[in-house]
Regions:
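A short acidic, helix-capping loop that chelates divalent metal ions and anchors anionic groups
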Residues: 122-124
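Terminal amphipathic alpha-helical/low-complexity segments used for targeting or macromolecular assembly
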Residues: 1-60, 138, 156, 173, ...
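Left-handed beta-helix
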Residues: 64, 69-70, 75-76, 83-84, ...
């Protein structure tokens, strides 16, 4: 509903449980990824053509001829799919609490943020309200654009620089975490 705001008069963050969010791997694997990411993956000296292989080691499904610049952050590689012939620009952030699926020939430019996570503003506990993101073949997420949870970027779509793209009514309804 356009212009609709959800107002919660009393927030009770102490009751936050994180229900419905599965990191997808045990803590030792998470720790190994964080160490590897911070010590090598994001560094300028780590070759861009090696980054896809390192993501694959940690469970990502990465296609051929993928070019990933330095300072690209990936929360959980095992929740990431990247098709062939994609470019991911410097300082992009793939915040994949839920899966991010990037089709072939996609350009994600410098400083872009793809964030599958959110919170339920109507819930006093502020529980998660996450949903996957899909990016269609040939799309371009321009510099410093933000793509929010539940969005489906159409094939060939351009998300202009500095804009925010959220799920629209035509996008799949994001699933509410922890609801029955």
């Amino acid at each position: 509903m356009k212009g609709h705001r959800t107002v919660v008069t009393e927030r009770a963050l102490r009751t936050f449980s994180g229900r419905g969010y599965d990191k997808g791997r045990p803590k030792p694997v998470q720790a190994a990824w964080f160490a590897t990411s911070n010590l090598a993956f994001v560094k300028w000296w780590f070759p861009p053509r090696w980054r896809p292989g390192l993501l694959r080691v940690f469970g990502a499904d990465v296609g051929e001829r993928v070019f990933i610049r330095h300072r690209v952050r990936v929360l959980w590689p095992w929740k990431l799919t990247i098709g062939d012939d994609c470019w991911i620009g410097e300082d992009a952030w793939l915040l994949d609490l839920e899966p991010i699926a990037i089709d072939h020939d996609v350009c994600i430019s410098q400083g872009a943020l793809l964030c599958t996570g959110s919170h339920d503003a109507a819930d006093p506990a502020f529980e998660y309200d996450n949903a996957p993101i899909t990016v269609g073949a040939g799309a371009w997420i321009a510099a410093r654009a933000t793509v929010l949870r539940g969005a489906r970027i159409a094939p060939g779509e351009v998300v202009p620089a500095g804009t925010v793209r959220r799920a629209s009514r035509s996008d799949a309804t994001p699933r509410r975490q922890g609801s029955s």
